[in-house]
């Protein structure tokens, strides 16, 4: 685990700590109409199962705002209300949810922000100042354009507004739709404030595009010690947002959990359908939370050398293969027996590691 994380002021969204020494939390956003409580609850359940820590819901009208009271009763995750344009919806939402997200570029005047702050103070819930490059307030957009400087100036201005109202229970996000502006904005603001950061690349695209952008922007920031909570925005399935986010946390050294998958690129030496087999192995063992390095190799030639540092490896040969544990061959089996035996061995190793951690 990396030890260079910037220590920020700690806030709480429900029972989830954000900032300070707290683990970096992941979140996503439902796409149902929030007033459709059954559909929204089903999506929140899916996110909970995927490993999300928090969930955000859109509040587009008064019906959505009023539905939050009932939704909060059944939500297994802390609930964040996402408010644009209509500050009065935030006043209603604050009575029920665990946090409010506002976009200072469209929420309105200082008086409206004060009303939202007062409502959040009363319920002791935090606010996210959600700055987006594409919707900056007029004075910052005209002066700086949709630049990192414009985003930072907007964030500082709004942070000062909240501080002047004696309110410091907030976090900040600075989102753009590309990697470089996102990184530069967070880097620029980090030394200037003590508040926790919500990381994200907005409108990042489909699974492929978003995974690349988010890994570069969020992963880069996390390795610099920047970031306290995060969302990977994907045009696609909810669960993928959490899956990719947790993978970024693992590979940036911020989360020691789950399997680190190692598999060779295909070449003329492979003796099996490696693409299908690697996918099959990963899917079958996706439930394991124990930190393990697991290798899936397409030939014995590579496996004996390249997989020797893995906790467990499988190597496919001509109608047979090897299972290697901590650098030593423990099974040579016919192809038909290889997969199930490998799964059992990995699950047993995970249990051994968990037991040793408890003893």
Swiss-Prot record:
Q: Which residues form a coiled coil?
A: none
Please give the catalytic activity noted in the UniProt record.
(2E)-4-hydroxy-3-methylbut-2-enyl diphosphate + oxidized [flavodoxin] + H2O + 2 H(+) = 2-C-methyl-D-erythritol 2,4-cyclic diphosphate + reduced [flavodoxin]
Q: What is its EC number?
A: 1.17.7.3
From the UniProt record, give the pathway where this protein acts.
Answer: Isoprenoid biosynthesis; isopentenyl diphosphate biosynthesis via DXP pathway; isopentenyl diphosphate from 1-deoxy-D-xylulose 5-phosphate: step 5/6
Q: Does the keyword Oxidoreductase apply?
A: yes
Q: Which domain of life is it from?
A: Bacteria
The residues that the entry says bind [4Fe-4S] cluster are 264, 267, 299, 306
Q: Name one GO molecular function term.
A: 4-hydroxy-3-methylbut-2-enyl-diphosphate synthase activity (flavodoxin)
Q: Which UniProt keywords apply?
A: 4Fe-4S, Iron, Iron-sulfur, Isoprene biosynthesis, Metal-binding, Oxidoreductase
Q: Name one GO biological process term.
A: terpenoid biosynthetic process
Q: Which Pfam families match?
A: GcpE
- Cofactor(s) this protein requires: [4Fe-4S] cluster
- How is its cofactor bound, per UniProt? Binds 1 [4Fe-4S] cluster.
Q: What class of enzyme is it?
A: oxidoreductase
Q: Write out the function statement from the record.
A: Converts 2C-methyl-D-erythritol 2,4-cyclodiphosphate (ME-2,4cPP) into 1-hydroxy-2-methyl-2-(E)-butenyl 4-diphosphate.
Family to which the UniProt record says this protein belongs: Belongs to the IspG family.
This chain belongs to which protein, by name? Answer: 4-hydroxy-3-methylbut-2-en-1-yl diphosphate synthase (flavodoxin)
What lineage does UniProt assign to this protein's organism?
Bacteria, Pseudomonadati, Campylobacterota, Epsilonproteobacteria, Campylobacterales
